[in-house]
Amino acid sequence: MGGTSLDPALAEIGKKNGLLVWRINKFVLEPVPEVDHGVFYIGDAYIALYQKYDGCWDVHFWLGKNASTDEIGVAAIKTVEIDDSLGGIPTQHREIQNYESPLFLSYFPDGIRYVSGGYESGYRHVDDQFKNWKPHLFHCKGKRNVRCTEVECEVNSLNLGDVFILDLGKDLYVWMPPESGRLERIKGMARAKNIADHERMGIPKVHILDDVEWDNDSTFWSYFGGVSSVRKVSKGKDDDDNYWKRLTEQITLWKVSDASGAAKVSMVSQGENIRKEQLDPKDAFILDAINGGIFVWIGHECTLEERSKALIWGQNYLKQHHLPRWTQVTRVLESAESTQFTQWFRDWVDEKKKNTFTPLLFQVSDESGLLHVEEIANFTQEDLDGDDVMILDALNSIYVWVGANANANEKKEALNTAKLYLEKDKLPRHKKTAIDTIFQGKEPPTFKKFFPSWDDNLFKNEVRSVQNMRRLLFH
């Protein structure tokens, strides 16, 4: 490892596989205990380092929506320090609250929770944390990637389509109205149990308000104006889905010029004309992959200073092209490119790797007539949700997996959804890519091979039902 004055807080990096997380606390890097992984204060900035194996690292630079400019600056400096100490080869990712990448979210299987304020505003001592407790309400939204965001503790914050957690300190209420989804319910219960058992030493009691109790529990409703207030709760809300945005645009490769001190970009090529040979080791390039995010590629002849500027160049590109600040920005280095980057080049062949494309899994739901698509990173068979339709993209084959409990419209439109996905997608693939429809419980070997392991019995029992998970979590 390089660097002679490594921050003591970074002493464990590179020593073992897995996840390390730090927060910026009073401009100092502070390790986050494993028990608090997945909890983010929206007034702070964080750094996460994931080591898949020695020599394969991903560094994520997370920004809360209320993080100060100074904290963001410290996080950026420390990210460069981590990068330098690991030989300058980690892939760097910029993460924005509410718009985190599927890869980042995959590190937290129970979902993530946003807490108001900064770390200093939170109670950290069991002895006094329940004094003068004020109720907190968390809105748990999402399918596989569940985010629990703190909202105003009032009836107008509730809706019938999502799960909410009412945090009363020594009591936690998981409110699961009829229209909420199976996975949201399971993740909501798991998050409440994690708060009770790990964050608060097992002191709080968890109350589950499901199809029977959701509209009549007097204690829960006392914080929202009484049981009669249930009539004021709105129906489920559909968020504007970002997946299909910008899909009419062309993927573009840009060359970065920083000679004048102000980074400028010039177009190199677009669409199917993008080639690996256009990447010059002496320069930096930006690949705008539309929904695939922004990649800043750094040639191996670039200086350390240029390596450290990569994410800044990416942010400047967003401003210059009037793109949302939450657009994913990832830095990749020559000879250490991930398949998430190389997949956009039709002619990219990596002799070191057997595969130049990593299969992608998407969850597709149509609960109220609005199509919602959500990518699942590091997927397993467990991620196949029987309530929905899933799309497995294997580049030259598209599999539409239809869950047994998908609604009638989802089943009817499954093939059309896959055709729309293929039509809008920008990946360089065979023009005659096949689409196969597969039904839950009847998966062929050609489909199963894309999963790390497969258990034919997984779909034959009720192990993944909400009631069974409730028994397992709160027996």
Curated annotation (Swiss-Prot):
Describe the effect of residue 388 to A: Loss of processing
Q: How does it assemble?
A: Monomer. Binds to actin monomers and filaments.
Question: Keyword set for this entry?
Answer: Actin capping, Actin-binding, Calcium, Cytoplasm, Cytoskeleton, Repeat
The cellular location(s) given in this protein's UniProt record come to: Cytoplasm, Cytoskeleton
Residue numbers spanned by region Actin binding, actin severing, Ca-sensitive? 1-131
List, in alphabetical order, the Gene Ontology terms for molecular function in this entry. actin filament binding; actin monomer binding; phosphatidylinositol-4,5-bisphosphate binding
Q: Which family does it belong to?
A: Belongs to the villin/gelsolin family.
User: Gelsolin-like repeats span which residues?
Assistant: 27-105, 148-208, 275-341, 375-447
In residue numbers, the region (F- and G-actin binding, Ca-independent) covers 240-475
> Which residues lie within the region annotated Required for phosphatidylinositol 4,5-bisphosphate binding and regulation?
133-227
Spell out the residue ranges making up region: Inhibitory for phosphatidylinositol 4,5-bisphosphate binding activity: 248-348
Is Repeat a UniProt keyword of this protein?
Answer: yes
User: Region labeled Necessary for barbed end capping activity — which residues?
Assistant: 1-239
Alphabetical list of Gene3D superfamilies matching this protein: Severin
| Residues flagged as site, Cleavage | 388-389
Where does the UniProt entry say this protein principally localizes?
cytoplasm
What this protein is reported to do is described as:
Calcium-regulated, actin-modulating protein that binds to the plus (or barbed) ends of actin monomers or filaments, preventing monomer exchange (end-blocking or capping). Binds actin but does not nucleate actin polymerization, albeit slows down elongation by blocking the barbed ends. By promoting actin depolymerization, required for the elimination of presynaptic components downstream of the egl-1, ced-4 and ced-3 apoptotic pathway during larval development.
Swiss-Prot/TrEMBL GO biological process terms: actin filament depolymerization; actin filament severing; actin polymerization or depolymerization; barbed-end actin filament capping; positive regulation of synapse pruning
Q: Which InterPro entries match?
A: ADF-H/Gelsolin-like_dom_sf, Gelsolin-like_dom, Villin/Gelsolin
For this entry, the protein name equals Gelsolin-like protein 1
Q: Give the record's PTM text.
A: Cleavage by caspase ced-3 activates its actin-severing function and is required for the elimination of presynaptic components during development.
Q: Please verify whether the record's keywords include Cytoplasm.
A: yes
Region called Required for synapse elimination during development, residue ranges = 106-147
- What cellular-component terms does GO give this entry? actin cytoskeleton; cytoplasm; striated muscle dense body
Record's Pfam families? Gelsolin
